[in-house]
């Protein structure tokens, strides 16, 4: 893998535990329930998920076999930076998908503590470091849940409505039977992925 700015990329091929051949086509009922419960619990403990981050991993040259490790590296970099600059903690849930057009990607819902300064360029540098490739335009998309950083405080009804929509979007790839049991408004297959399909912080 090509070095970037003289630095070794964080993703390295080979080695025990770096790859997995297990695949999945849907989120299982338990996985979807866990993501939904984690989003609700984050709100209860004062760590509302306020940012929706989408990373087009395949577009950035990150193979499906390396996707889980890349997501973990990104979350670790963000967590450590948040701790260093605010002495606070993040919370998150994430779900991977594989689209026919954009390929492998991940949706991450984040809580960032008050006072943390979000900078897109910093995130781009991390993505470059993880992938070992120059940032490709369109790899990162980010929006605020509830439209503003403090929507959960200033307009809680709007925030909760938007949060429900975004979490529903995150779990739309649940298998049809489970989706019906959860009464999801949107159920749509989101492609086959290799390795872990979703995750959450230990909040």
Outline where the language-model segments fall:
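Right-hand nucleic-acid polymerase module
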Residues: 1-104, 112-203
């Amino acid at each position: 893998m090509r070095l970037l700015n003289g630095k070794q990329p964080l993703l390295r091929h080979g080695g025990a535990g770096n790859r997995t051949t297990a695949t999945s086509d849907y989120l299982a009922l338990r996985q979807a329930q866990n993501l939904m419960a984690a989003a609700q619990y984050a709100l209860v403990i004062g760590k509302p998920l306020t940012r929706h981050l989408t990373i087009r991993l395949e577009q950035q040259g990150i193979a499906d076999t390396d996707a889980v490790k890349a997501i973990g590296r990104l979350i670790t970099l963000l967590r450590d930076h948040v701790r260093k600059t605010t002495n606070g903690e993040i919370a998150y849930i994430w779900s991977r998908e594989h689209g026919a057009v954009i390929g492998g990607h991940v949706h991450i819902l984040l809580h960032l503590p008050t006072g943390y300064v979000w900078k897109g360029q910093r995130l781009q540098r991390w993505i470059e470091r993880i992938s070992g490739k120059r940032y490709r335009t369109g790899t990162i998309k980010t929006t605020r849940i509830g439209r503003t950083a403090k929507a959960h405080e200033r307009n809680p009804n709007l925030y909760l409505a938007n949060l429900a929509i975004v979490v529903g979007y995150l779990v739309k790839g649940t298998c049809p039977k489970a989706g019906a049991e959860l009464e999801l408004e949107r159920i749509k297959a989101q492609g086959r992925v290799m390795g872990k399909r979703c995750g959450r912080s230990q909040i």
